[in-house]
Amino acid sequence: MSDLPLDLVEEILSRVSATSLKRLRSTCKQWNTLFKKRSFSQKHFHIAPKESMVLMLKEYRVCSMNINLNVSPPSVEFQGTLGIKDDSHSNLGQVEIVEVYHCDGLLLCATRDNRLVVWNPCLGETRWIQLKDECRRYSTFALGYENNKFCRRNYKILRYWGWFHDHIPDDGGRFRFEIYDFRSDSWKVLDDVPDDRFPPRDLIILVFRHLEIMVLWLYQLLEKNNSQCYKRLRHQRWRYL
């Protein structure tokens, strides 16, 4: 393919599946540069054949699975563990994952040592995100994006966490909501969320996996009690896939 025009090469590669592109990245530097272009990513997203990947969190590792529903009984086969690149560790197996959130083919992983990483398992790319503190007790995360027609998707993370006083019966605890913006690489605290408007401890441990569910819940909770916070959340325009 080295003799083909670059636009024709791009047209051919844009029809290759994502898992195959991962193997091609080390084949040619010119191709690897092409894969990083925004225009190619958008074209590949719309043209390439869609693939499904079944993943399972097992013993702090993300494992790929093969599920066959066409046999009786249906079979489930573990295909192996997917390693996450971590520049601070030489061994890929040292990254222990406790929670995984999904959006648009990306995985948001919370590690056992209180770190966050956004991971593209098809391409093997990672982005480590610094938390401003190490207090993750009762933390819940959600990964989504702001859909703006004038620019590409701006991915964001919603963090919802709290702490409790064990010696106080029926204590509602204290809570914080933070939003991480990928473009600015920064966290923003929603500091006007009232502490006294949340359900008791037994309801807090419910996991709100989807941004739309999380934000809708906040709408209903805060609409009549804190109009300013309600408006701020309402205009985030989240999407979750």
UniProtKB/Swiss-Prot annotation:
Pfam families the record matches: F-box
SUPFAM superfamilies to which the protein is assigned, alphabetical: F-box domain
InterPro entries from the UniProt entry: F-box-assoc_interact_dom, F-box-like_dom_sf, F-box_dom, SCF_F-box_component
F-box domain residues: 1-44
This protein's name: F-box protein At3g22350
The organism of origin for this protein: Arabidopsis thaliana (Mouse-ear cress)
Higher taxonomy: Eukaryota, Viridiplantae, Streptophyta, Embryophyta, Tracheophyta
